[in-house]
């Protein structure tokens, strides 16, 4: 779906939206894997003091709860009185509702596609960022794109078709298909530390935030478990222990969102992976 927010932050000081400290603000929801990918990019680049952050409630709420005819759902904040109002394009006022993540400057909404925002944070702030970490290095761009369109998309699609299945029977069928993809990923990770090259990239951040959500919702009674795939377990520990990543994970918000969507479902039994335990992934570098 095309976005009405398709502007870009650029390095040039003469750009319409130049990279500047304190000019941009990020709105994220911890229960959303796409928003957490962007939050991870902000942290890995060391932009915490340059790009502001507001965290929404883990579940969309009715934006006009007193109007029974308006069923629109959108962002809410734990303390909305402290959240700055936002003026969008053409001086139009926008309540804090919509698709997340969003990057906003003091005048306009900029972008709401997670991959675009990740790459803007990675490139536009390169000269200002304390960290020289690159999520999308030019020399690996083609391989990262192939990974995103390949194994990352397969795992993401498998997770959502299982998690959002309409019946238990369909969920089990989709789960079996998902683990076929997981086995392929585990075999890949037996040979290499990361999905692309010898460094963590945006492909790994995307994969991580999908896999941990599956770990959260999987059941002890499942015939197959994520913990049976030791290369994936080590991979998840490796990424989780990378500075800036652990703070993008909020298990409580994930559970709150799941319970809201499936109020009759039992409480989640995961996560099962011990994310803070040692790993030996560096040996593959």
Give the positions of each predicted feature.
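C-terminal alpha-helical interaction module
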Residues: 1-285
């Amino acid at each position: 779906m095309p976005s009405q927010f398709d502007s870009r932050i650029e390095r040039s000081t003469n750009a319409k939206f130049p990279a500047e400290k304190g000019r941009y603000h990020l709105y994220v929801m911890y229960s959303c894997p796409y928003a957490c990918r962007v939050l991870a990019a902000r942290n890995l680049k060391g932009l915490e003091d340059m790009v502001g952050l507001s965290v929404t409630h883990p579940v969309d709420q009715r934006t006009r709860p007193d109007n029974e005819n308006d069923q629109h759902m959108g962002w809410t904040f734990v303390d909305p009185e402290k959240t700055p109002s936002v003026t969008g394009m053409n001086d139009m006022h926008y309540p804090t509702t919509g698709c997340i993540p969003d990057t906003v400057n003091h005048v306009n909404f900029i972008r709401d596609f997670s991959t675009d925002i990740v790459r803007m944070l990675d490139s536009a702030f390169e000269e200002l960022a304390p960290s020289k970490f690159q999520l999308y290095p030019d020399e690996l761009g083609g391989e990262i794109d192939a990974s995103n369109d390949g194994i990352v998309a397969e795992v993401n699609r498998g997770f959502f078709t299982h998690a959002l299945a309409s019946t238990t029977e369909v969920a089990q069928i989709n789960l079996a298909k998902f683990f076929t993809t997981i086995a392929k990923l585990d075999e890949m990770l037996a040979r290499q530390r990361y999905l692309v090259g010898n460094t963590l990239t945006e492909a790994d951040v995307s994969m991580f935030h999908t896999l941990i959500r599956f770990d959260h919702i999987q059941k002890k009674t499942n015939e197959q478990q994520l913990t049976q795939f030791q290369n994936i377990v080590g991979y998840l520990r490796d990424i989780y222990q990378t500075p800036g990543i652990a703070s993008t994970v909020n298990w409580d918000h994930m559970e709150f969102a799941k319970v809201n969507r499936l109020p009759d479902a039992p409480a989640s039994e995961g996560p099962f992976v011990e994310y803070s335990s040692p790993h030996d992934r560096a040996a593959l570098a």
